[in-house]
Amino acid sequence: MAITAALVKELRERTGAGMMDCKKALQEVDGDMEAAIELMRKSGQAKAAKKAGRVAAEGVILVKSEGNQATLVELNCETDFVARDDSFLEFGDKVINAAFANKENDVEALKTTDIDGQTVEKTREDLVAKIGENMNVRRVQTLEAGDVVATYTHGARIGVAVALTGGDEDLARDLCMHVAASSPQFVKPEDVAAEVVEKERSIQVDIAMQSGKPKEIAEKMVEGRMRKFTGEISLTGQPFVKDPSMTVGELLKKAGADVVTFVRFEVGEGIERKEEDFASEVQAQVAAASKG
């Protein structure tokens, strides 16, 4: 029987599995839809796909470095319990090693990389079927720059890498800890993206205009607030966590060093977690019971 695009589409919709996996399953059972679903359930593919809709906002940040290269990977799961599971962590080790070896920056490319004779994605699907939780290789970034690269992890939930020119490993590690604690978004105030500056400036202009101050004073207020804003979200403009009497920029100048770039990953940042409304759930159950 010919395996049509419509058949593959239907199987994808019913299992949530990948297109190639669906096509392969249909070919193996000569186009029998129900047999293909059963085959995929037995192999764990349908089971893994069914769990793919769950929010995976827990997990670990994996970090590997050598010389002036560092690679970070975020590996997510649904619960903190699985984040400590040996099988999950063993999978994570294989993923970070593969990402580091390939100097990977593309998570989709990482998913197609071979580990132990099969792709990262297939290994993930097998592990989902085994453990019973959704998990996801969410992102990867490799930093290769500067004279000195240091890394820091905080409880496996935050991972940081910093690349310096000048300075030494102690300074680089101190800056890693600072980045972990203070979450800068840019290296220097002048690096702040134009759209970020424009959005904040429009807000500050509205606030200044509502103050009733003369135009020239309002303009100075806006400029002062913008300097403060760009300083607060940039690494060199922030007070150094180990000595707030100086900024990171002043610390770097004193050490004769510069930050080339940095990476900061935190588990689950930007993932919308599902909020469980237990009160509404109980009310619905009570209402249903009273009708019965």
Curated annotation (Swiss-Prot):
SUPFAM superfamilies in the record: Elongation factor Ts (EF-Ts), dimerisation domain (SSF54713), UBA-like (SSF46934)
GO cellular component, one term: cytoplasm
Pfam families per UniProt: EF_TS
Spans annotated as Involved in Mg(2+) ion dislocation from EF-Tu: 79-82
GO molecular function: translation elongation factor activity
Transmembrane segments: none
Sorted UniProt keywords: Cytoplasm, Elongation factor, Protein biosynthesis
Subcellular location: Cytoplasm
Role: Associates with the EF-Tu.GDP complex and induces the exchange of GDP to GTP. It remains bound to the aminoacyl-tRNA.EF-Tu.GTP complex up to the GTP hydrolysis stage on the ribosome.
Entry similarity comment: Belongs to the EF-Ts family.
Name of the molecule in the record: Elongation factor Ts
Biological source species: Idiomarina loihiensis (strain ATCC BAA-735 / DSM 15497 / L2-TR)
